Amino acid sequence: MVGLGLLTLVLPRLAGQTPISKIAFGSCGHQDHPLPIFDRVVEHEPDLFIFLGDNIYGDTDDMEVLKAKYQMLGSKPTFQRLKAEVPILATWDDHDFGRNDAGRHYPYKAEAKEVFLDFFGEPMATTCKDHEGIYQSYYYPVNGNMLQVILLDNRTFRDKLQPYNGEVADQGRYFYDLDYAPYTSSDSTLLGETQWAWLKGELSKPADLRIIGSSTQFGIEFNGYEAWANFPHERQRFLDLIKETQANGVIFISGDVHYAEISKLEQEDLYPIYDVTASGLSSTWYFATPNQNRIEGPIMDNHFGLISIDWEQADPEVLMEIWDIHDNQRVEYRVHLSEIGFSEE
């Protein structure tokens, strides 16, 4: 277990509050919608809420338009209640970054970052101000354990996606048009070298549970849409980095797709990597793509994700849940920290 003296970076706004044991999260909420889901979130009394991207649908090169859309979100009574009662962290995806499926070539990414930080404020405004992009990490000591929250930036440094041209055998699984193909070479990047170097440093720090927020799905198989599967060498690099740093307790949370599911990645010499997707604060989609890594879901109704940790157990238990707009529990999956860590020799 990690002692409190090993790390001292604790969010000022959370100091003195109840230790973090319940984290809510979600993505894909349209500013034109009433967003009643935030009332459901608050009713569950989480210690933290994480926005995983598409927090608004900006889709503009005009920063005044982008600001106005954030202001529309900020004017929602349900958002105001969430902000007043629950500490917030946030990263972005393409629609709040600026353009659909955009990456590092988007010309207004610096301006969009400024608008993002102006809206969400602290602690992101301090954490992200001195480097390009909005990748960030936070540490919370809890009962002699350490919780680490890492939020990735999947937009600022990402190379262009490779258009799909029939590279993948259909086999009758794909009942829709595929947009993108996976790279077959390793000369492209999703995170960029600066973020990779930072990430290695973060994973090298001691923690018992690491919640890693990725705006796009990490754990799914290739589906022809945006995901880490389009950059298979980058996903493998991440898995190899977990092994290299012996980083225990990694669980991904993700968004983007307008439905919920849990995916499970298994690889030799590595504990199972879970990816809890919660992507439908107000947006919906009419189908879920094939995903042989799916172990729970899909849930197509509006929803949010919830991770609860029972730190009082000798082997703390992590509960992963999806709750829908009607306050129905739709997914329940449990693991102990001993199941998501490297065996001690």
Regions inferred by a protein language model and the residue ranges of each:
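Metal-dependent phosphoester/phosphodiester hydrolase catalytic core
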Residues: 14-345
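Bacterial N-terminal signal peptides
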Residues: 2-10
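N-terminal export leaders
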Residues: 1-2, 199
